[in-house]
A protein has these predicted regions:
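Flexible, glycine/small-residue-enriched loop-and-beta-strand segment within the central core
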Residues: 35-44, 62-75, 79-145, 170-171, ...
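Conserved sequence/active-site signature of Rossmann-fold short-chain dehydrogenase/reductase
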Residues: 106, 156-157
Length: 183
């Protein structure tokens, strides 16, 4: 039976950006983005400076981590809670009126468990308008959360979440329809 050989791992094909930009981002990210200071505007300034597309009102709470801002698009109003991890090895697009709650993770990378060399896999994540990602939830690569869908606390989503549907569990399964009332 074949075994995993991590010594053979090679992701040299993966080019997320210029090396200088990545290194400079790691410093700025550690000092200004992940820090516990309360200034969302400062986080937005640096994310935009490094190439994030950000429109409208966006609130980014303390402790948020973003792997590569130049692969991030946010169309506010959007709320991103404390300690959210956007591990965007691929593109992440967040539409208006989305809420990503505390400790949630958006993971655009994984590994091919069938490969002896444990090859890197990447894929995009799309959050359409009005999506709510619950606290401590995980959204995996190649996932589309359709309009106004909800991923409940601690759940894991991959694939497609249908519009106006609440999902729960690991793997996340449809629980019920989301009904929104005026007022």
């Amino acid at each position: 039976m074949t075994k995993v050989d991590l010594a053979g791992f090679d992701n040299s094909w993966y080019k997320p950006g210029p090396r200088w930009k990545i290194l400079l981002w790691y410093v700025v990210n550690g000092v200004f983005i992940q820090s516990r200071h309360p200034f969302s505007g400062l986080r937005l300034f640096w994310l935009k400076w490094f190439g994030a597309t950000i429109h409208g009102s966006v609130v980014i709470r303390p402790g948020v981590r973003v792997k590569y801002p130049w692969k991030l698009k946010i169309y506010g109003p959007v709320w991103i809670g404390e300690d959210v991890w956007i591990d965007n090895l691929d593109s992440v697009s967040i539409a208006a009126h989305c809420c990503i709650s505390q400790g949630a993770m958006l993971l655009c990378g994984n590994h091919d468990y069938k490969s002896a060399k444990f090859e890197l896999l990447t894929g995009p994540i799309v959050l359409e308008e009005g999506v709510w990602i619950g606290a401590k939830s995980v959204v995996c690569l190649n996932t589309i959360c359709r309009s106004h869908s909800i991923l409940s606390v601690g759940s894991i989503a991959s694939g497609e979440m249908k519009a106006y549907t609440i999902y729960k569990g690991n793997p996340a399964i449809p629980l019920r329809n989301r009904e929104i009332h005026n007022g």
